[in-house]
Amino acid sequence: MSSNLAFLSLSLAESTASLGKSLEETRTRLTEKLKLVAGMALGFDQFAMHQTATGPGLSVEGKQTEQMSRKSAEDTRASSLSSDPDDGRAAQLAGQKGHVTPCIAGLIATSNPFLFTHMLALGAAYLGYDKYFGDGTSELLPFYGTRTLLSTLSPLDTPRLLDSMAAADRLSPKRSILSRFSRRKRSLDAPAPEPSGWDQKRKSRLPLGSLRLVLDILDRHLEALTTYVQQQIEIFRQAGVPLEASVTMTHNLNRLHVTRCQSRNNQMVIPCRWKDTTFFEELSNETNPGLTDEEQLEKRVKFHKLENAFNTVTGLGALEAMLDEDSVLLGGPAEESVARLYSDFHLGAAMNNWYFYDALNINKMLSRFQKVGTKVLKQYGLENLMNLATSHQAGSTASWDRTDIDTKLAKHHHYGSALRVRLYIMALLPQFTPHREGILSPVDFIREAFAGERSYAMSTARLKPLLSDDLVILGVPKGFSFLWLFEFLLEEDSPNALVAKRRALKRIPNWTKRLFSHSRSIPMLFRQFYKALNAGVFAKARRRTLDRSKTLLSRQLPEGWRDIVMDAFAFTAHSAALMQVVNYHSLFRDRTLNDLQEASYLATPPAFSIEDQSVMKRCDEQIYEWSRFGFSPDVLEADLHNETFKGKWENLRLETMPTPDTHQWWRRLHRAILDSLEIYQAHERHLKGMSDNLYTLVEDTIKNLQDGSSRDDTIFFGRIARGARESVGQKMWRGVKTFFLDLVRDVPGSDHAVWFGVGFNFPRIFQILRKMKEIALHAAGDQGSAILLDEAFVELVQETVAVRAQTYRRQPPTTLRNIGVIGLRPDYANLDTEQRSMEYQLSMCADHCVSLWVQILGFIYPYVLNPSLLTDYEKSFGTGHAIKKLDDPSYVNSFRYIFANDASLNFFEHNTPQDTRKALVSLKSGQAFMYANMMRFAGIAFEQLSMPYLAVSLQRQAPFMGQMVKDWVAKRSRSRKLAIVSVLSLGLIFAYTLLSALDIAQFLTDSGMKAIEDCSWNPIMQQMACVVVAGSGSLVAPTFAALSDVFKVGLYSGIGSTLIAASVVGNAYMIIRSQSRTILRTEMAIKNVAVKLWKQMRKYFSWVTRFTKRRKAILSTMMARATALAKNKKPRSETAATMTRSGDSVMDMLLQGVSPATPQRAQDGSR
């Protein structure tokens, strides 16, 4: 009991040093203070009134004291209404006017989650006083104060403390029979992670009553608070501070302040204040006054996020340190951080995000509140209370007969309904609200807050804080932070109902496996049939389903989703600018220009011309070289444009020269594109200053691409520009052409695509996708609508882009938009920088935002719905062998890769949108570059889904995957053509065989006929008389003729048809091969092995050849020199004997790396 009293003493801001003096005296003093604070000021005496009817609340000895305390509290309320409003604690609850129902103030008035935790802990101590601090013979339950609960916030430790306080057990979810017999077993050396306590249902052994309710509320609240603290730690981790959620807050406080506190007078004070950190110095507005408004806004948001996280981590760490009176962290800044932690009312706004309460859910909740409340109140004859609240007749307290309410409630003692009735009455009871200067019930207050009538923070009470003597103003921001408390009114088993709801949100829809799985056992035809069966087979039915999906999205998408649709992309390379060096590259005559030689590189750059080939073709050639020989380790090639490489050798400081990552292939290709644009700029420099739109556009694109972050953030995509309108004849010709091309798995070819560069704001993108997942889960009853959410969202994006980007003014009237035509404002070059940047983004978004969202919905959305679809890939790429092969260009065509996952080809066939797949097939240049960028985009996105191995592998292997897909497209088309030829060959062989068989049969018939006879009737003999016609007899017997023909056919086929038989087998293989992806990929793997062997052989023989040539060259040189030397010093006869030997020895020394001068001097010395 003494330990429990110690925790209670800390919760009531008492010193634990007095506990040893007199335990009974301390207990009495704490009891009185607890009654004053929790019983009256916080309103938990209302719960205790009901507790006496359903279970023990306070001890029996204290009931009389409780009644006196309650009577004194009522007297205090009465005096506060009639006398000075500052007298009494009840007046402190209401501010300067009137009184407010204490239980409402205690439960839902405060918007500070940490102070609310303190209130709930005190309420639990008050309601369960006998169970924690009583003198009974029964075993007391442990009690933990606020500091202990807040200092141990974690999904594992906090539920254990609360379970011990509530005498509760966590029930693990039941495993299905299939999961029990699953063949996938966890290895013995990898123990199963311990599940979070909040993901399990809770079964309390406490009797139904107020204490159990408060502890259930505290359990849910601390779960949300733990999530919030983990988010703050993640903010620091992204900022480079090594904090961890698995260590104590004191350790995190030390790490944070040691790394980020600034030293003053050569001394570092820990803990320090926010203004003394490096974050404050880096992000304050005074440091970078030259930033744009958007950059200033981003910087301001980051500043407030870090400040909030700093205050949270520092406050919780200092709160934990207060448990140790000898801690060195105690002091002024620590106490200030704790006070700030308990007084910042802005922290309550995060509760809305924790529990998904937007305006739609609030309306649903209030509607359900009225329906369930009417049913519950009707059992007591109090349904008129709901009618009064509904008809807005609760403007005065005279409408409520409190005596009648108490009389009816006194007749019922069943907790399951009586306590819920009291809570409903408390929610409907009118009370004075300071922000309205009038009477308003909490339910009406919620309606008003979410209706937008009050957009400012509304102060509702002035509560005397429980840790100091200063008054703290508490407010309720718009959104009403603790609406989730009403879940306890709407659900019979509210804590477990919330667990079930959370599990439902984590549940994976079954239809995702059928539609998005990469399993080869589910054919594409079955996927299409399944989708049509659920969404609607006929066009009208599908349209109705699509309209329902659009309605769901329009109502439930977060506020401001249309802004996210437009702001999710930052375009860095304009399509009209890239078209100059891709689509129109042959129009420029730049071979004679010397612009490239003017570049200040360390070495002369390779001479190339945009006239000879487009930049995308050069990128494809570079990818092809990488796929054959791997990434070049050349530092200059890896990062040619690095600042330290500019200038001359004498200006280069080797100690500061960076070592670039030679595996960042995207930087090299980014540099190639930028070089081409710079060549164009030099070619058209005469347009500078002439307000030319195109030249200005190229200048802006170069500036965007030269930005430091652009090299890593920009991803290049290409799209095929199609003709907007066609005549009837053109459509017929296109249909015929498409039909024949489909037979050979081809599409109409395109020389170039319309290319552009874009950066993605993945946090905002995932905000939309995760909300769509939530909508799909809630729409489980309408599976068709859930399946078509992606298509419905694309239509909404099209409507949003059409309005926001003003597409109507980017093409002439009555014409359709063609992305190959520039769509800029005519006065683009004359706009200022800010307006030009806005028009730059809008013009690109008008053409490409819809296709980018289609790309996102194809590559990311399926795995947001069902992340387990990527689990096999993550395991496969996480093996030691796969990690070693990260930079191996032959890995994508190896047997192990093909039969393990073949991820690149699966993503191409299952996730690539149809238009993009057609573009990859039709392009003549840029195929490998496009798919490499798509794989890099997927890799970056999968990092957000916690798939690190898959993400890194896709990014590093992207060029090799791009070349493999390019080869795959060509191989499939080639195999189909060979299959068609094989079908024709087999058809001709079959026709020849059939005709031959018919001919043989006819010959057998002809050669085996009987002789022709002339017959007549003999009347005397009464029979036919036949005479053989001369010359009509058979040549041979039928049996002999048949045997002879069979022998001849067998002989001829054995001699001449052996090739035909081989042709039949070969043609049959070609047909089967064309339809089998496994056979084609196996052929590619065999070719890969053969190429590797050939490279090894060439490498060996080339070394031998180089060695022989070098030896002969040096030998001939040495022989020539020796001959010249011999002519001057020795007779011819002496020289001839030693010439060859000396030349050979010198040659061998040179090849071995030994200087030839040393043995020569030794030889001279010996002489």
Swiss-Prot record:
Annotated segments matching region Disordered: 55-94
Which terms are listed as keywords in the entry?
A: Disulfide bond, Host cell membrane, Host membrane, Membrane, Secreted, Signal, Transmembrane, Transmembrane helix
The UniProt entry lists membrane topology as: Single-pass type I membrane protein
> Does the record bear GTP-binding in its keywords?
no
Q: Which residues cross the membrane?
A: 978-998
Q: Which cysteines are joined by disulfide bonds?
A: 1015-1026
Q: What is this protein called?
A: Rhoptry neck protein 2-like protein 2
Give the species this sequence originates from: Toxoplasma gondii (strain ATCC 50611 / Me49)
